[in-house]
């Protein structure tokens, strides 16, 4: 694959070639201690499967890659998102590119190019794993994962936020 942008593009193309889009009863990595290499054949997978494979491939090759999770609100259903969605971001030489392989597969778009979901709509990002650094009075704090918010009610009860509340943030 070589290095640089061509290497990232080659690994994205490899992940695209290894999957068809779907929600299988058994995931390609069920029962595995590590993400397996898919050397031949094609596996059925959702955005979770495809992007788990892609992030593992990118990181194994030495690229900085993030697994992002959130909600996608299709233009035709702006008031709700039934499921979550995930995608990948890469950072190379200061440039951050988003890769939404699963939605490119669903839309029949090949080759996969750096872009978010090709369908019109809105995204609400709720977790990001590329790492963050924040300056504080005590020094720098590094966080590996920013995760999905939860509501904490008086008395300590924790619940998932309403999707409309997330969209309003």
Predicted regions and their residues:
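Hydrophobic/aromatic-rich core segments of domains that either
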Residues: 49-140
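Alpha-helix capping and helix-loop boundary segments enriched in small/acidic/polar residues
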Residues: 42-45, 76
């Amino acid at each position: 694959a070589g290095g640089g942008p061509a290497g990232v593009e080659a690994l994205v193309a490899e992940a695209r070639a290894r999957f068809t889009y779907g929600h299988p009863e058994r995931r390609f990595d069920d029962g595995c201690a590590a993400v397996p290499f898919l050397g031949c054949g094609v596996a059925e997978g959702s955005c979770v499967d495809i992007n788990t494979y892609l992030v593992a491939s990118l990181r194994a090759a030495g690229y900085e890659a993030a697994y992002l999770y959130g909600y996608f609100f299709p233009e035709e259903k702006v008031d709700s998102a039934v499921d979550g969605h995930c995608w990948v971001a890469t950072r190379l030489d200061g440039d951050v590119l988003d890769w939404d392989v699963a939605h490119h597969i669903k839309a029949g778009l090949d080759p996969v190019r750096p872009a978010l979901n090709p369908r019109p709509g809105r995204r609400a990002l709720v977790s990001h794993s590329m790492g963050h650094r924040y300056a504080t009075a005590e020094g720098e704090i590094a966080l590996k994962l920013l995760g999905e918010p939860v509501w904490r009610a008086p008395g300590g009860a924790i619940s998932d936020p309403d999707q409309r509340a997330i969209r309003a943030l």
